[in-house]
């Protein structure tokens, strides 16, 4: 069964290049996190002459045969909030962020709830989230195309990532000539302040 998403990761890469065009930026440092890392890879593949450097964070090459997300995490990810009421949505995302978060850098639940509520109040668009998931699932593997990337590349990945396991970062780095891989002990599929400070 072939899934045709409303938009693809390649479409998102074209949008990113369109933003650079609109800003009259010829070349840029391209950074992407999770799905954004996949889009950043697509940008570097499609327009290598526009990329000063590539940083792919907790992302994947899309190669087949890599370890899958933990099943308990997938169950939480694929579950829907009990209702569209803000409190139910916050409860859902608290469960999700606890499931994918960094075991070495736990976030107090009160802080997590406050941050999630601000995000929900600013913009909650579950159909858009679903479209993004479909775009990821339907994207072809970038594995063979990554060899075309010649820009300096940094691959950053949590060693405790339960959603996109560390092996995905290792695979991405080995496929890009000269790429440097940095793993962070105890970091899951989020961006705790301590590892982020080291990234910067």
Range-by-range predicted roles:
Residues 73-144, 148-151, 171:
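Alpha/beta-hydrolase
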Residues 10-28:
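Conserved acidic catalytic loop of the alpha/beta-hydrolase fold
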Residues 45, 52-84, 128:
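Flexible "cap/lid" loop of the alpha/beta hydrolase fold
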Residues 149, 155-157, 161:
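Short beta-strand/loop motif that positions the catalytic acidic residue
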Residues 178-200:
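Catalytic active-site module of serine/aspartate enzymes centered on a nucleophile-bearing elbow/loop
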Residues 32-36, 40:
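Gly/Ala-rich beta-loop-alpha elbow adjacent to hydrolase catalytic centers
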Residues 29, 52-55, 147:
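Residue in the alpha/beta-hydrolase core beta-strand immediately N-terminal to the catalytic nucleophile
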Residues 159-164, 189-190:
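Acidic catalytic loop of the alpha/beta-hydrolase fold
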């Amino acid at each position: 069964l072939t899934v045709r998403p409303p938009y693809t990761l390649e479409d998102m890469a074209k949008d990113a290049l369109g933003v650079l065009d609109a800003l009259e930026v010829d070349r840029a440092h391209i950074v992407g996190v999770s799905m954004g890392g996949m889009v950043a890879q697509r940008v570097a593949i499609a327009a290598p002459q526009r990329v000063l450097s590539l940083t792919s964070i907790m992302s994947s090459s899309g190669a087949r045969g890599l370890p899958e997300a933990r099943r308990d995490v997938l169950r939480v990810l694929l579950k829907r909030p009990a209702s569209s009421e803000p409190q139910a949505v916050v409860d859902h995302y608290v469960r999700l962020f606890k499931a994918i978060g960094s075991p070495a850098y736990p976030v107090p639940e009160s802080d997590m709830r406050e941050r999630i509520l601000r995000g929900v109040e600013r913009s909650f668009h579950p159909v858009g989230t679903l479209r993004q998931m479909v775009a990821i699932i339907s994207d072809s593997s970038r594995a063979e195309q990554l060899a075309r990337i010649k820009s300096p590349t940094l691959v950053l990945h949590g060693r405790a990532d339960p959603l996109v396991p560390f092996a995905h970062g290792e695979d991405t780095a080995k496929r890009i000539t000269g790429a440097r891989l940095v793993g962070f002990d105890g970091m899951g599929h989020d961006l705790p302040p301590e590892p982020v400070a080291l990234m910067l």
